[in-house]
Structure formats: structure tokens, C-alpha cells
Amino acid sequence: MADLKVTQIKSSIGAKKNQRDSLRTLGLRGIRKSVVREDNPQNRGLINVVRHLVTVEEV
């Protein structure tokens, strides 16, 4: 499977608790911070919860 580069583009201020928790679980701690994660159903689910706060690229 490919890897996914996830970049936070919007602040988590005002987001619901489960959305903030999903960002932390992905390893994102601020705007314009990026992480590379394996492309699997668990990570896709976390990304889906915060899809309005992040961008995703295949690496």
C-alpha cells in the first residue's frame, strides 16, 4: 500500500472534541504541519473525520 501525506490546513479551534482527538491521533499538532501515514482503513477513517481541516496526498 502507498503512504499518505496529511497536512493540517485549518485550526482545530472550534472543532468538536472527536475531531481534535483525530488530529492528535494522526500526529498533527498545528497548522502547516505534515505527517506521513500508511494508507489503511484506520487512517482513512481518521482522515475522513477531519477532511475539512486537512489535505491529503499520496506519497
UniProtKB/Swiss-Prot annotation:
GO terms for molecular function: structural constituent of ribosome. It comes from Nocardia farcinica (strain IFM 10152). One of its GO terms (cellular component) is cytosolic large ribosomal subunit. Belongs to the universal ribosomal protein uL30 family. This is Large ribosomal subunit protein uL30. The gene is rpmD. Part of the 50S ribosomal subunit. HAMAP family: Ribosomal_uL30_B (MF_01371_B). InterPro entries: Ribo_uL30_ferredoxin-like_sf (IPR036919), Ribosomal_uL30_bac-type (IPR005996), Ribosomal_uL30_ferredoxin-like (IPR016082). One of its GO terms (biological process) is translation. PANTHER family: LARGE RIBOSOMAL SUBUNIT PROTEIN UL30M, MITOCHONDRIAL RIBOSOMAL PROTEIN L30.
